[in-house]
């Protein structure tokens, strides 16, 4: 399982562009900058923070489907198992939006959580 990554600062930046840029009127701008699998996120965090315990195991899809019978909330992700959704953010980039890479967003978010003592 995975999802499209975006740094919250880039979401704010895109909101500002959407409010200020006349070419943004009437457009739907996607605030996402690349799909990444959870196992890739885990590997990235493990390399960046080797002293931290980062879960590396992934629940197999068959088990996720089985458990979703008992935990209905899991049902919402079943259609997305093994799907790498590619979203088109080119309209936003044409307006001058320059989001951070997924790697930068993940590492920055992790550092912030550590600095705040949350993890």
What name fits each language-model region?
Residues 1-6:
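A conserved pocket-lining segment of Rossmann-fold NAD(P)-dependent short-chain dehydrogenase/reductase
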Residues 8-11:
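Mobile gating loops/cap/lid regions near enzyme active sites that modulate substrate access
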Residues 13-75, 102, 107-119:
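Mid/C-terminal beta-alpha module of Rossmann-like enzyme folds, strongest
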Residues 67-97:
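Conserved C-terminal active-site "lid" loop/helix of NAD(P)H-dependent oxidoreductases
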């Amino acid at each position: 399982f995975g999802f499209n990554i975006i740094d919250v600062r880039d979401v704010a930046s895109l909101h500002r562009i959407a409010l200020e840029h006349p070419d943004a009127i009437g457009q739907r701008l996607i605030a996402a900058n690349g799909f990444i699998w959870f196992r890739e996120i885990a590997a990235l965090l493990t390399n960046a923070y080797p002293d931290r315990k980062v879960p590396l195991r992934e629940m197999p899809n068959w088990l996720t489907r089985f458990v979703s019978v008992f935990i209905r909330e899991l049902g919402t992700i079943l259609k997305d198992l093994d799907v790498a959704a590619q979203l088109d953010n080119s309209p936003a980039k044409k307006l001058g939006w320059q989001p951070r890479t997924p790697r930068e967003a993940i590492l920055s978010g992790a550092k912030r959580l550590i600095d705040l003592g949350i993890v």
